[in-house]
């Protein structure tokens, strides 16, 4: 068999960025949700100061008295264009993409001074948050019955909800919070983050939850169902469902989590959790190991691709002989790709779709290989999925390279980060929590609602 790498030996790789002004974020065709606590939000703040200093502060990028949103859209693009007329940006090349409102390296340096350029991880985070759309400071999203019309959330006299509970797309999460989509169900990431933050700053967590503090303490210990068993009498599902169907309690939890998203202590716990060996660390190494067995070295685009799949899907398939054979056979057929790494990403996307959100997963995956294929090479299904979801791409919009190798970081074990949540083995529920969740929510319909004619 001809080695896979040899098949690509005569094929030019993805074009390296020109020697001109390199792109950091290009939001000219679609807004980028980088996050209100990201380095890009700090850029917005500094850009507003730069504009104010040269008399071009209106319309504002960041209105007076407000915090930056981290959403890179029209206001930021127009702010960059106006700033090009300021003395502080006189060294930005005249032919720079910045003339269209693109955030480039020369614009960053002019506005941010000695602040380092955004890292590959920070750019990947911005792309992933643009997909997830669950920023710090936002209310959490409930995943119960999420595929149907949920009415007023009131059970009927017979104990069933006043709507049909459809949940095909995300039956095991129950509740989602924060930019990496932390859940209270299968992953228990919400429990981990709150427990870590509570032990570091008890008063902050206790103040946020108020009268729900006792419930929060029970929440840490309640049994979950794992990734496979998401229906029926699962204690943590009973607990969260009872909150979801009780408007005052629901608001208390939503307000608490939204408030805590503004806490530096909580955000640090969140970041440390995901960076740990128990979460991203081992999975990133597993993806890199798969690439190594295929004779590939992960690039910047690969790193973002891995991190996105970890967020939305999980670990890669097991590296058995069948998987490796299928990947190699697929890559050999991808002769229109200008990069073997892009071919591998497309092949993995096809080999390992999402169990319940296949179209969304495909749409996200396409954003990591779209730029490596000529027009007409991808299927109509791929293009429509990408264009109909969040049409961003790692190379075009985030300036990531499919040539530059990416470093897979060493990760610390969770045990090194402090207090570990208690064992989730409790079934302690109040009588109202046991009665408060309709059977139709505990046992949802695992399909999407029929289309309305």
Describe every region a protein language model picked out.
Residues 6-452:
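Cell-envelope/ECM-targeting effectors and their regulatory/trafficking segments
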Residues 1-4:
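Sec-dependent N-terminal signal peptides
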């Amino acid at each position: 068999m001809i080695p896979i790498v040899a098949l690509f030996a005569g094929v030019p790789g993805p074009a390296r960025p020109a020697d001109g002004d390199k792109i950091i974020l290009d939001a000219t065709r679609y807004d980028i949700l980088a996050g209100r606590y990201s380095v890009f939000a700090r850029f917005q703040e500094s850009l507003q100061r730069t504009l104010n200093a040269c008399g071009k502060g209106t319309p504002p990028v960041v209105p007076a008295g407000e915090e930056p949103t981290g959403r890179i859209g029209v206001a930021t693009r127009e702010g960059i264009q106006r700033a090009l007329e300021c003395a502080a940006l006189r060294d930005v090349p005249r032919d720079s993409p910045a003339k269209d409102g693109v955030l480039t390296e020369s614009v960053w340096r002019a506005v941010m001074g000695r602040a380092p350029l955004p890292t590959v991880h920070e750019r990947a985070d911005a792309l992933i948050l643009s997909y997830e759309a669950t920023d710090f400071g936002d209310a959490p999203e409930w995943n119960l019955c999420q595929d149907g019309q949920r009415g007023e959330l009131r059970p009927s006299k017979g104990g069933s909800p006043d709507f049909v509970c459809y949940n095909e797309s995300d039956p095991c999460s129950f509740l989602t919070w924060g930019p990496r989509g932390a859940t209270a169900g299968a992953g228990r990431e919400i429990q981990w983050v709150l427990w870590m933050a509570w032990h570091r700053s008890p008063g902050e967590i206790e103040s946020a939850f108020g009268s729900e503090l006792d419930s929060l303490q029970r929440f840490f210990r309640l049994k979950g169902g794992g990734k496979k068993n998401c229906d029926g009498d699962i204690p943590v599902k009973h607990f969260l469902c009872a909150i979801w169907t009780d408007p005052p309690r629901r608001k208390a939890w939503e307000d608490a989590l939204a408030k805590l998203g503004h806490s530096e202590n909580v955000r640090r716990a969140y970041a440390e959790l995901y960076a740990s060996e128990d979460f991203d660390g081992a999975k990133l190494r597993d993806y890199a190991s798969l690439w190594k067995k295929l004779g590939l070295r992960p690039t910047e685009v690969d790193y973002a691709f891995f991190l996105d799949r970890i967020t939305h899907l999980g670990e890669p398939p097991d590296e058995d002989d069948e998987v490796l054979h299928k990947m190699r056979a697929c890559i050999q057929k991808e002769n229109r790709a200008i990069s073997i790494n892009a071919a591998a990403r497309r092949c993995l996307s096809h080999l390992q779709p999402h169990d319940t959100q296949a179209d969304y997963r495909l749409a996200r995956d396409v954003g990591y290989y779209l730029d490596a294929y000529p027009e007409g090479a991808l299927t109509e299904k791929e293009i429509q999925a990408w264009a109909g979801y969040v049409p961003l791409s790692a190379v075009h919009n985030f300036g990531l390279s499919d040539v530059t190798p990416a470093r897979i970081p060493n990760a610390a074990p969770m045990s090194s980060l402090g207090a570990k949540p208690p064992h989730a083995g409790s079934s302690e529920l109040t009588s109202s929590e046991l009665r408060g969740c309709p059977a139709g929510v505990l046992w949802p319909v695992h399909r999407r609602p029929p289309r309305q004619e």
